[in-house]
């Protein structure tokens, strides 16, 4: 009778094990410490140099700068090292201490890696032309010279919030900023005096 019985091996149910999936965080080239976006360096520099800057903005800029190590060439061309060095003498201990950390780390790295350049990311000439025009419009609305630090800071903050692109949101935001500065004298004075932070001003007009 056994020859008519097909025997199959018994399959034992093994306990199900929940496998923990590894979560990988994708790294972008800009997240690397030695990859330096020149535009970001210049934007943070204007934040550090703008008079009556808030402690929060200074700390935020220094924390971003701490994530990067510019090459000797970038330090020389942007003078960001000088800006950080000046902040070391800030009256607030936290700001001064953070600036000292950034400055010391950069100096130590440059001295130990003189022959290792960083990767620099620049804007193209067409983009720079559009931005110069935006700065011109902002300077006229603010009644300041085009090379004034406040004009540069507003434009760079706008460019940053628009993903560093000359796109429709950038153009519309610039127009909104210029219109407000021209026709709202009280806001213009608040921006010029520093009572209305540049970041807040630009963010509220972002299109």
UniProtKB/Swiss-Prot annotation:
Q: Which residues carry this modification: N-acetylmethionine?
A: 1
Q: Which UniProt keywords apply?
A: Acetylation, Nucleus
Q: Where in the cell is it found?
A: Nucleus
This protein's major location comes to nucleus
Q: Which Pfam families match?
A: Med26
Q: Which GO terms describe its cellular component?
A: nucleus
TFIIS N-terminal domain ranges (all copies): 39-113
**Database matches in InterPro entries:** TFIIS/CRSP70_N_sub (IPR003617), TFIIS/LEDGF_dom_sf (IPR035441), TFIIS_cen_dom (IPR003618), TFIIS_cen_dom_sf (IPR036575), TFIIS_N (IPR017923)
Positions of the TFIIS central domain: 130-207
Q: Is the keyword Nucleus assigned to this protein?
A: yes
One GO BP annotation of this record: DNA-templated transcription
Which family, according to UniProt? Answer: Belongs to the TCEANC2 family.
What protein name does the entry list?
Transcription elongation factor A N-terminal and central domain-containing protein 2
Recorded source organism is Rattus norvegicus (Rat)
Q: What is the lineage of its organism?
A: Eukaryota, Metazoa, Chordata, Craniata, Vertebrata
């Amino acid at each position: 009778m056994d020859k008519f019985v097909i025997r199959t091996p018994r399959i034992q149910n093994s306990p199900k094990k929940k496998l923990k999936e590894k979560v990988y965080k994708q790294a972008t080239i800009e997240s690397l410490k030695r990859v330096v976006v020149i535009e970001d360096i210049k934007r943070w520099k204007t934040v550090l140099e703008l008079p009556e800057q808030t402690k929060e903005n200074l700390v935020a800029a220094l924390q971003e700068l701490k994530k990067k190590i510019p090459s000797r060439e970038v330090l020389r061309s942007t003078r960001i090292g000088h800006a950080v060095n000046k902040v070391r003498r800030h009256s607030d201990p936290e700001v001064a201490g953070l600036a000292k950390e950034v400055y010391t780390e950069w100096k130590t790295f440059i001295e130990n890696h003189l022959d290792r350049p960083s990767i620099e990311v620049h804007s193209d000439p067409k983009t720079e032309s559009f931005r110069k025009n935006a700065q011109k419009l902002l300077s006229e609305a603010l009644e300041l010279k085009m090379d004034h630090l406040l004009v540069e800071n507003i434009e760079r903050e706008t460019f940053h919030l628009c993903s560093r692109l000359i796109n429709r949101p950038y153009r519309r935001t610039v127009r909104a900023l210029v219109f407000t500065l021209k026709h709202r004298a009280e806001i213009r004075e608040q921006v010029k005096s520093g009572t209305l932070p540049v970041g807040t001003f630009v963010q509220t007009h972002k299109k």
